[in-house]
């Protein structure tokens, strides 16, 4: 079965798993999903990520969620740019999430990074999602 929006699938799986208190999330892996998960790990929103091979040679991404005092660290996870309406922003138009308390994940020509890293690198790109 083909997936229309794999990034939205990743975000929804993380959001649903955190809502019910699961420790890990397993989903089909891709380069962009691993890159987004790596940004979440670098920013402290998740504990760990692993890419493993299943029996039928498919790559599987396992994300270990992070909790603080019994509550998920990720409170808000929202897809911004979507397959039907891509949202591109220049380096001066990159959004700040919750006045700088959250992050926006941006797909740039230099890879996937946070809004702060994109501003520092002086590049714009597609605003994939918001995390807070």
Swiss-Prot record:
GO annotation (BP), single: translation
GO molecular function list: rRNA binding; structural constituent of ribosome
GO cellular component: ribonucleoprotein complex; ribosome
Keywords: Ribonucleoprotein, Ribosomal protein, RNA-binding, rRNA-binding
One Pfam family per UniProt: Ribosomal_S8
Family: Belongs to the universal ribosomal protein uS8 family.
Function: One of the primary rRNA binding proteins, it binds directly to 16S rRNA central domain where it helps coordinate assembly of the platform of the 30S subunit.
Subunit: Part of the 30S ribosomal subunit. Contacts proteins S5 and S12.
Protein name as it appears in the record: Small ribosomal subunit protein uS8
Species name: Xanthomonas euvesicatoria pv. vesicatoria (strain 85-10)
Gene this protein is translated from: rpsH
């Amino acid at each position: 079965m083909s997936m229309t929006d794999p990034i939205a699938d990743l975000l929804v799986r993380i959001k649903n798993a955190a809502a019910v208190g699961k420790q890990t999330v397993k989903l089909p892996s891709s380069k962009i999903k691993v890159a987004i998960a790596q940004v979440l790990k670098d920013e402290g929103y998740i504990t760990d990520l692993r890419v493993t091979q299943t029996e039928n040679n498919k790559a599987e991404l396992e994300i270990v969620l992070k909790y603080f005092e019994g509550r998920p660290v990720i409170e808000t996870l929202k897809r911004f740019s979507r397959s039907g309406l891509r949202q591109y922003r220049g380096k001066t138009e990159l959004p700040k999430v919750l006045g700088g308390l959250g992050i926006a994940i941006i797909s740039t020509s230099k890879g996937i990074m946070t809004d702060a890293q994109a501003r520092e690198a002086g590049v714009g790109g597609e605003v994939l999602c918001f995390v807070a």
